[in-house]
């Protein structure tokens, strides 16, 4: 029996590369609190948007997803004092949220696995405690999206036709409640958002892990490189609130090894890819 550690090694590399950036543990200081989704009709006030310059897979390419990470950025100016702020979000691809440069939510590999053409899970956060609430103050919303769950080989086992031509996309609705009780919603659109390929993530896939260049600034730090997005019409399925099967970093479950064993007379026992770069092209 030959021991195949490829999948486990890849999973470990994903977790490590998701955790670290040039500023340290980026997901260990997440802000925002999960809350109930807005009513489903709120999605009508938004569009799926993609970066015009986002690369796409044009052929099978050995199952490799398109390079680069799509970034989406918008700045919202308060018309009045804010007393409540909720952000309902969904992504075509694995996505990470930021408000004024701070990561929102502690989930990993959001939105998780669903049938890529039928259903996408949404995540809604109460971000009242982290936004600037004074009148005329500005808040920057930003999102990174990579191909996982949407445009990489995990969605099409046995064939890669499903990943051809797909662009990462983001959709969201910000609901602000003002001090006078009135509410206003800001959905993703082509006028108030910017998009482009940027940031330190140069390639990402569920099975393949990430290529990460920590010398590069985050997408919200180089907005001048972004431009007007385009509407994405590739997904026509349902957007449903997450059902509670998310992945979190559980430091409370960390265990320290007491003993270690080396198995002898087992074929492939010492064959593994720990510590090696396994995603890079040869």
Describe the residue ranges of each PLM region.
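N-terminal secretory signal peptides that target proteins for export/translocation
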Residues: 1-7
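Short glycine-rich, low-complexity segments
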Residues: 6, 23-24
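Short terminal (N- or C-terminal) low-complexity/amphipathic segments
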Residues: 7-10, 31
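Bacterial N-terminal signal peptides
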Residues: 10-22
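Boundary at the C-terminal end of the N-terminal hydrophobic targeting segment
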Residues: 26-28
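Solvent-exposed, flexible loop/coil segments flanking beta-strands in beta-rich domains
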Residues: 32-80, 90, 241-282
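Accessory beta-strand-rich segments of carbohydrate-active enzymes
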Residues: 62, 67, 72-214
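Activation corresponds to long, low-complexity, non-globular regions
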Residues: 183-282
């Amino acid at each position: 029996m030959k021991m195949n550690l490829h999948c486990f090694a890849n999973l470990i590399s994903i977790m490590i590369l998701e955790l670290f950036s040039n500023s340290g543990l980026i997901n260990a200081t997440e802000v925002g609190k999960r809350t109930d989704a807005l009513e489903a009709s709120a999605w009508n006030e938004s569009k799926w948007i993609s970066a015009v310059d986002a690369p796409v897979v044009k052929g099978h390419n050995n199952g490799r997803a398109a390079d680069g990470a799509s970034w989406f950025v918008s700045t919202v100016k308060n018309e009045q004092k804010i007393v409540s702020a909720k952000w309902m979000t969904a992504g075509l691809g694995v996505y990470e949220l930021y408000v004024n440069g701070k990561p929102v939510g502690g989930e990993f590999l959001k939105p998780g696995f669903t049938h890529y053409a039928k259903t996408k899970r949404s995540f809604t956060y109460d971000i009242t405690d982290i936004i600037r609430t004074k009148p005329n103050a500005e808040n920057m919303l930003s999102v990174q999206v990579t191909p996982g769950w949407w445009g990489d080989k995990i969605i099409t086992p046995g064939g890669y036709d499903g990943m051809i031509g797909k662009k990462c996309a983001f959709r969201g609705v910000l609901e602000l409640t003002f001090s006078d009780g009135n509410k206003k919603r800001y959905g993703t659109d082509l006028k108030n958002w910017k998009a482009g390929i940027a940031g330190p993530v140069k390639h990402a896939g569920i099975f393949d892990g990430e290529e990460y260049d920590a010398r590069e600034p985050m997408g919200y730090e180089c907005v001048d490189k972004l431009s007007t997005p385009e509407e994405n019409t590739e997904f026509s399925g349902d957007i449903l609130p997450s059902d509670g099967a998310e992945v979190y970093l559980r430091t409370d479950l960390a265990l320290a090894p007491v003993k270690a064993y080396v198995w002898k007379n087992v074929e492939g026992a010492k064959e593994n890819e720990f510590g090696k770069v396994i995603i890079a092209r040869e």
